[in-house]
Amino acid sequence: MADPRHVLHEMHYVLIPGAWMGAWVWAEVAETLRREGHQAHAITLSGLDGSDDDPARVRLATHVQDVLSYLRAHAVEDVVLVGHSYSGVVVGQVAAQAPERVAHTVYVEAFLPVDGRSLLDVSGLDVEHERRLIAENGGLWPPPSREELSQQPFLDADLIQRLASRLVGPPGHTVTDAASVPRPLESLPSTFIAGKDWLSFSREQDLLKSLRRSPRWTFRSIE
């Protein structure tokens, strides 16, 4: 346990994994936060734990409800909600729908939710191509192959092996369903953490530029 003299303020972090991943991907981060004296929990979203054989049942709203249900079940308020990649779309909706429970939202190289648009709509990917892949893969969005992972410069051989053995396809509706964002993102206290080229290919550049003008948003760069 961390020396309480070194903890300025105990926070409760809830960590949401990106597409193809479960709570396991946050294990080291969660342990580091706990050593610093914080509470930290990671959630595996519906359809990503291997227990559901009907991907059509799981929608984007299901993942939003997964997080809301966790916060309510544990009576959690003033939480720091952290999302990565796909789950930025999830945590942004949770913060907009339950601002009384979310003190701060952190987007770690994450996509942002846009009301009425899906992850695929804002991602910069070929939407029709991705939809075909989902249809051909039993309704699941296929994870990147080992070859595709090996093309990522920040992944070493051990991490590539770990990811290739554990990534699973999320239900396709989670990336094709439109987001519901009842409050403007610029009104919600948030931090956006990313490398300089993150989202350079996406359709969210104008949104990011507008959010940089919000006093409630902080931007941090990964070198």
PLM feature segments, named:
Residues 96, 100-102, 106-143, 174-175, ...:
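Flexible "cap/lid" loop of the alpha/beta hydrolase fold
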Residues 196-223:
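Conserved loop-alpha-helix segment in the C-terminal half of the alpha/beta-hydrolase fold
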Residues 44, 80, 103-106:
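Residue in the alpha/beta-hydrolase core beta-strand immediately N-terminal to the catalytic nucleophile
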Residues 39, 45-79, 96-97, 120-124:
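Active-site loop/oxyanion-hole signature of alpha/beta-hydrolase fold enzymes
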Residues 192-194:
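Short beta-strand/loop motif that positions the catalytic acidic residue
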Residues 162-184:
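Active-site nucleophile elbow and catalytic-triad environment of alpha/beta-hydrolase enzymes
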Residues 82-87, 91:
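Gly/Ala-rich beta-loop-alpha elbow adjacent to hydrolase catalytic centers
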Residues 8-52, 72:
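Conserved HGGG/HGGXW glycine-rich cap/lid loop of the alpha/beta-hydrolase fold
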